[in-house]
UniProtKB/Swiss-Prot annotation:
All ranges on the Extracellular side of the membrane: 1-28, 79-102, 158-199, 262-274
Topology versus the membrane: Multi-pass membrane protein
Chief location category: membrane
The encoding gene: Or5p70
Entry keyword annotation includes Ligase: no
Protein name, entry field: Olfactory receptor 5P70
Disulphide bridges: 100-192
Length: 330
């Protein structure tokens, strides 16, 4: 049942997600593409986490943050992708009121955590390049744990503000969300109550998160670039800058898309364009992050080669021993 009668009002109990398209051919194509992206996202980020855990060479603060970033990327993608895939197969694709709030809250929580993790990683690079002698002190295990825990706490705080805003909205009319997941903008459009308070609270909260993390990242990289330019050796400059390129690429993709979706005036682009940007933000970027950090990072590539080399060597020894035993038994 999509509606309940509450006195003189009709209360929405479930929503219909319209998804990306109604074209049956395009739906099949998109289903295949997004399913492949999701599988690569989960496998790629899990591989990153496992590689960091098993490789002692990667037991450094930067990779500690990266392992948490990979976990968050799996969560972000998993919060919307399974439901999006179901939308391609089932019509209409409904989601309950509580289910919508859970999806909405989890997406906000994980995106906020990612913002602060990216800021923590920028600070880590700042200390490593600008204050290398103090690196072991400033980026101790305790400090790294505090930064990660702080990221999750900020995620919970921001998600709580968005959750309260969601439950302050009353839905008594149309229940068709013109999106592939429960996002704030289409929910506000469907609300039949005053949305001013909800919009103000979420705008202030999201604005604070964005400005704080962007400020930390901008200051960190400004100091990094100044330090790099002061280096006399070209090789030293290249080595220092190469340690930042992966993170800088990830930051540019994440914040560039975020700014376009949530900062640009809605009149400047259509709802369909917003959906495409949201797919890139929620589905594609979590897949790209492990590729960015692995392809542009010599330490990760080296650890992967060593790990695969050990596996191949152990399997080779096992095969030789088995073959040797079989030969002598004959």
């Amino acid at each position: 049942m999509a509606f309940l009668e509450d006195g003189n009002h009709t209360i929405v109990t479930e929503f219909i997600l319209l998804g990306l398209t109604d074209d049956p051919v395009l739906r099949d194509i998109l289903f295949t593409i997004i399913l492949c992206i999701y599988l690569v996202t989960v496998s790629g980020n899990l591989s990153t986490i496992l590689l960091i855990r098993v490789s002692s060479q990667l037991h450094h603060p930067m990779y500690f943050f990266l392992s948490h970033l990979a976990s968050v990327d799996i969560g972000i993608s998993s919060s919307v992708t399974p439901n999006m895939l179901a939308n391609f197969l089932v019509k209409p694709n409904t989601i309950s009121y509580i289910g919508c709030s859970i999806q909405f809250t989890s997406a906000v929580f994980l995106a906020t955590v990612e913002c602060f993790l990216l800021a923590a990683m920028a600070y880590d690079r700042f200390v490593a390049i600008c204050n290398p002698l103090l690196y072991s002190t400033k980026m101790s295990r305790e400090a790294c744990i505090q930064l990660v825990v702080g990221s999750y706490i900020q995620g919970l705080l921001n998600a709580s503000f968005f959750t309260l805003s969601f439950f302050s909205l009353i839905f008594c009319g149309p229940n068709r969300i013109n999106h592939f997941y429960c996002d704030l903008a289409p929910l506000v459009e469907l609300s039949c109550s005053d949305v001013t308070l909800a919009v103000v609270i979420t705008s202030i909260s999201a604005g604070f998160i964005t400005l704080t993390t962007v400020f930390v990242i901008a200051i960190s990289y400004s100091c990094i670039f100044i330090t790099i330019m002061k280096m006399h050796s070209t090789e030293s400059r290249y080595k220092a800058f190469s340690t930042c390129t992966s993170h800088l690429t990830a930051v540019t993709l994440f914040y560039g898309t975020t700014m376009f979706i949530y900062v640009m005036p809605k009149s400047s682009y259509s709802t369909d364009q917003n959906k495409v940007l949201s797919v890139f933000y929620m589905v594609v970027i979590p897949m790209l992050n492990p590729l960015i950090y692995s392809l542009r990072n010599n330490e990760i590539k080296g650890a992967l080669k060593r790990y695969l080399g050990k596996k191949i060597f152990s399997y080779g020894n096992l095969f030789c021993k088995t073959h040797y035993n079989d030969t002598h038994q004959v």
